[in-house]
């Protein structure tokens, strides 16, 4: 941890976090994702082992790409928080939690792929049962750290922060985090359609939707979870576009975007629990 010191009355030294260290935590975590993505890309070509009908390396690659986007979003939005809050312990701890949980999650997922073992819904051994439980806790903490940074963006924005990106980023992180937690709980509980992401249909990803792998024979809880997670990117992009094209419509536009995002997540979730494929 990088710290700076500054004298205050009545004390020899006081400590405060250096915002660059918080930002560097996120960059380091992105570096870990990239470092694992390169061999995963090579492995998917040369390793013909399958899990649930698709390459064992399919899941690590999807998670590596998703976590790069999530951590990158936090890194981009972090400078929009006003200086006092940005240099405080709250933001630093949120970034530390995000970096550690994202790194731990992807290391385990990649390790399990290398072993040819499932990382999710795997209780075949005591260690894997424990690891899956810890991964669930880590994923929740990762999302909560994003929620915290979103609240900082909304409540303590920098005076010179671009309004569209600041509002879109703040609401995107808050709304996206809440929706992600709800869909992740439903997905991970195993109470809808049994353990796994399938609801009805063939319990295999072999003939899944191109690129995403979503079931085409029944419901798939991953669809709603995907849209929930990427609200964190969609609303900031919408905010930037509205700020550049129609500043007066920024707030109503973001509200409409938020309502639409909720509708998409709820709609695809209901579709999945009814056992219907996305396409």
Residue ranges and their predicted role:
Residues 51-60, 121-134, 162-167:
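Non-cytosolic membrane-interface motifs at loop->transmembrane helix junctions
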Residues 165-199:
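Aromatic-rich transmembrane-lumenal/periplasmic boundary elements in polytopic membrane proteins
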Residues 188-231:
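Membrane-interfacial catalytic/cofactor-binding modules of polytopic membrane enzymes
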């Amino acid at each position: 941890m990088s710290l700076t010191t500054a004298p205050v009355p009545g004390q020899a030294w006081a400590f405060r976090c250096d915002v660059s260290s918080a930002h560097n935590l996120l960059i380091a975590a992105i570096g870990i994702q990239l470092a694992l993505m390169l061999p995963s890309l090579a492995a998917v070509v040369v390793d013909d082992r399958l899990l649930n009908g698709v390459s064992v390396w399919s899941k690590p690659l999807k998670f590596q790409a998703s976590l790069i986007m999530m951590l990158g979003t936090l890194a981009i939005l972090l400078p929009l928080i006003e200086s006092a809050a940005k240099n405080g312990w709250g933001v630093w701890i949120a970034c530390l939690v995000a970096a550690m949980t994202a790194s731990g999650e992807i290391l385990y997922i990649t390790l399990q792929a290398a072993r040819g073992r499932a990382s999710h819904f795997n209780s075949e051994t005591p260690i894997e049962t424990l690891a899956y439980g810890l991964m669930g806790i880590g994923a929740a903490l990762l999302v909560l750290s994003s929620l915290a940074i979103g609240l900082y963006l909304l409540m303590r924005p920098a005076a010179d922060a671009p309004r569209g990106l600041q509002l879109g980023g703040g609401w995107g992180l808050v709304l996206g985090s809440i929706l992600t937690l709800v869909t992740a709980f439903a997905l991970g509980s195993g109470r809808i359609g049994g353990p796994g992401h399938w609801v009805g249909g063939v319990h295999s990803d072999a003939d899944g939707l191109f690129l995403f792998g979503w079931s085409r024979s029944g419901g798939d809880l991953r669809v709603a979870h995907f849209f929930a997670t990427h609200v964190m990117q969609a609303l900031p992009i919408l905010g930037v576009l509205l700020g550049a094209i129609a500043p007066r419509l920024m707030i109503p536009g973001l509200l409409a975007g938020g309502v639409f995002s909720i509708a998409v997540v709820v709609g695809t979730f209901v579709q999945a629990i009814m056992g219907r494929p996305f396409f």
